Amino acid sequence: MTIKHTQDLAQIRAMVPEMRRVKAIHFIGIGGAGMSGIAEVLLNEGYQISGSDLAANAVTDRLADKGATIFIGHEAHNVAHASVVVVSTAINEQNPEIQAAREKRIPIVRRAEMLAELMRFRHGIAVAGTHGKTTTTALVTQIYSEAGLDPTFVNGGLVKSAGTNARLGSSRILIAEADESDASFLHLQPMVTIVTNIEADHMDTYGGDFENLKQTFIDFLHNLPFYGQAILCIDDPVIRELIPRVSRQVITYGFSEDADVRIENYRQNGQQGQFTVVRKGKANLDITLNIPGRHNALNAAAAIAVATEDDIRDEAILRAMANTQGTGRRFDHLGEFETGNGVAMLVDDYGHHPTEVDVTIKAARNGWAEKRLVMIFQPHRYTRTRDLYDDFANVLEQVDVLIMLDVYAAGEKPIAGADGRSLCRTIRSRGKIDPIFVPDSQTLPSVLANILQDGDLVLTQGAGDVGKVARHLAALELNIGRMQQI
């Protein structure tokens, strides 16, 4: 089912009071997934929304169509009429809009603080973890929508069935992705929290101390009220280690024998996964999940655990799993194309951590074992490439053909030896595959044209602008003749 939306602003106002004296809200970096989602919900709640970003995109265009004022570029006068300014973590203190807001004594809040305000008068369901947050948030949203509960949701990526990454619903339920990258999720005070897994990522935030990261997750779980619920993946060794330190009700899920919500008999058939979910005191569920991979079965089990605790009908759960369209850039099937030399399949995926890349490769192998796997990989951030260098090399050498783009810096300065060329050299020296380094993504189509074979699965992978490369390849329909002309 496509997620439907009904709302009555007067009804919502009765549940969620207006922020006192706040009329106009300005977002610096409004084009990002997390920022735009909050902006869209607040816009639909009746606030005057403005925002700025360095470039227009589909998100800013949609917000403008809905009535937001969008500025391209950051200028001091953009905040002239703001009651409050919301900033993303990507914005530094030298930004002229931040400086102007400080001079005018306009309150400046982080994205998570505004999300916390949205959650304050609602039944909040927060989804945290190193991997799987976006898909799990979408699956929870799909279930509650199938059950007719019309939730508000704010996700870090496109919920395909809704056609947006955020929406204001008419019920008191708010489902939100919680971001640990800057520890700002500590502002949130949900009723239910899912934690999918905990790995070393964004370690600059935590002083390079993994114990600090683990304690921050514990602190986040203790933001739950005493009657709240922690839905935790017991397959994850770090989470299993931390469970005794969680002083809230814990419900576990996973493939493990001791999981409260247990996955059995997983098998994959192309784009679909099929498995049984065993629940304590409830009937088993035979699930058909319309997105591939064991990792997505875990994401589904988390959503099912939450829904089961909320007494949502099994029929709604089963429909949601079978009908989900997934999320944007998560094993996103862009098509199968006649290339001029046979047929090739194109998939785009956002995964940019070695664990995420690994599970994507496994999903591709399990669903399309006969296909040659051609990966176009773009490392994301020099610090991540440096910190997880060997892990990246170990994972990337599993593909059949590797085309490597250079690092998407995301504002970071280059780090010697932590770039695409170095990673290629390391992988090549191991002798399993011979990676191809492409420093300019504009030349990639012509490089791919000389490699493509009948039956290939082409997988674009990464969190930077490689998604645009994927869309360009789809527009070219992987046609060898057209790609050679680029």
Swiss-Prot record:
From the record, what ranges are coiled-coil? none
What's the chief localization of this chain?
Answer: cytoplasm
**Catalyses which reaction(s):** UDP-N-acetyl-alpha-D-muramate + L-alanine + ATP = UDP-N-acetyl-alpha-D-muramoyl-L-alanine + ADP + phosphate + H(+)
Enzyme Commission no: 6.3.2.8
Task: Look up keyword Ligase and say if it applies.
Answer: yes
GO CC terms, sorted: cytoplasm
Localization, per the record, is: Cytoplasm
Pathway field of the UniProt record reads: Cell wall biogenesis; peptidoglycan biosynthesis
- What GO molecular function terms would the record report? ATP binding; UDP-N-acetylmuramate-L-alanine ligase activity
List this protein's GO terms for biological process. cell division; cell wall organization; peptidoglycan biosynthetic process; regulation of cell shape
Q: Please name the Pfam families in this protein's record.
A: Mur_ligase, Mur_ligase_C, Mur_ligase_M
The role this protein plays is: Cell wall formation.
The family database entries (HAMAP family) matched by this protein are listed as:
MurC (MF_00046)
According to UniProt, the name of this protein is UDP-N-acetylmuramate--L-alanine ligase
Q: Look up and give the organism this protein is from.
A: Vibrio cholerae serotype O1 (strain ATCC 39315 / El Tor Inaba N16961)
Q: Which gene encodes it?
A: murC
